[in-house]
């Protein structure tokens, strides 16, 4: 292909300087005023590359051996002058180099005058050349055509339709713009079809039939809904009945908790400090603890971490003291009741000599969660062990963390808030009626359960407490005794 254009190139340059034209010869053309400025541009044989690309293309080495007048595009000064002249006035030829002479109509190469050479009307069919989206690319015409087969005004300095020279321009066939569409290039030759396939164009989205890949709509049968039995609506309970049911469930839960505490602590009359996790069955022991520096340091730690005021901390201390007084009163009442003692279960019930069991006194270590025999040697051996030294430090930090949680939970209780308001007014907030006392007990036991659930994730028994898992009986926990734990009936 390039060889033929190379031989024709010499002929066109000779005719450029020798041939003359007249107005009569150009009178038959509809756009004859453009005739004198048209000339076959040798640049079309380069392959239609962009003028701003390198001068050496894919087929330049072949053109240099077969009749091409110029070894390089910009070496000959005469060629450069011709290129500059045609680039300013005409813009070069718009013939596509991908079409060989065998595909061109008869008479094109014959010297029949300027009229047949310059008119593009016979070549404006969409079956001859593919429509282009952008021009001046590889294999593309130098400038787009208009509706009548001639060149567009863009080639002669007219207004541009796209952004920049020769970009974003669309072909027009018959005066109708068809953006993104190209002619039927299936009838073109192999080279032309290859060029047309490289043209960017909008592709229509593939048609997806409904129901092939998507979900099919479930069709319900007319009589299917009639066979289904509709469950009867649940009876709506009144607010009083719902409240009564919740109260009964809460009391049953409290009863089970009291039984569990009774099995754990014996008579359930242990004196506890919820902040320090201190437990004692002696009144004197709890009194000494409440007045000790350990208890005061714990209150200072809570105030420092929670930023509570001094009256708040005094109120929390009074709550612990009030709990101690309640426990002492219930304990005195239970000791006076002989019937309660008769109903007390015997610890050794069902134990026979063959079981080889005996009742002994033990010492419980809350830091290690182990039971140590109540012997001097056993207690001293446990105190000097490495496990106890590690566990007591970790347990102390755990108590500090849980004390903050306990204090915050107590103050968030609505009943405690009401008592705190009375305390600020100078009244005694702990004198309550029997009904209020029952409600207080329910609130306190609910709070106890929440605190125990919150303290479970913070207990670390993996490495620091290896003996606790093996020695502590299942279900026992002496480390979480909230402020409001009571055993009132």
UniProtKB/Swiss-Prot annotation:
Entry annotated with the keyword 4Fe-4S: no
Example GO BP: embryonic body morphogenesis
Keywords: DNA-binding, Metal-binding, mRNA processing, mRNA splicing, Nucleus, Repeat, Zinc, Zinc-finger
Zinc finger region(s), C2H2 AKAP95-type: 273-295, 365-388
Motif (Bipartite nuclear localization signal): 200-221
UniProt GO MF annotations: DNA binding; RNA polymerase II complex binding; zinc ion binding
Role description: Core component of the DBIRD complex, a multiprotein complex that acts at the interface between core mRNP particles and RNA polymerase II (RNAPII) and integrates transcript elongation with the regulation of alternative splicing.
Cellular component, GO annotation: DBIRD complex; nucleus
Record field: compositional bias (Polar residues): 7-22, 91-100
One Pfam entry name: AKAP95
Residue ranges, compositional bias (Acidic residues): 433-451
Region of interest (Disordered), ranges: 1-28, 62-100, 133-181, 205-263, 431-489
Keyword S-adenosyl-L-methionine attributed: no
Gene it is expressed from: znf326
Protein name: DBIRD complex subunit ZNF326
Family classification: Belongs to the AKAP95 family.
Superkingdom, taxonomy of origin: Eukaryota
Subunit structure: Component of the DBIRD complex.
Localization of this protein: Nucleus
Biased composition (Basic and acidic residues): 62-76
Main location (coarse class): nucleus
Family annotation (InterPro entries): AKAP95 (IPR007071), ZF_C2H2_AKAP95 (IPR034736)
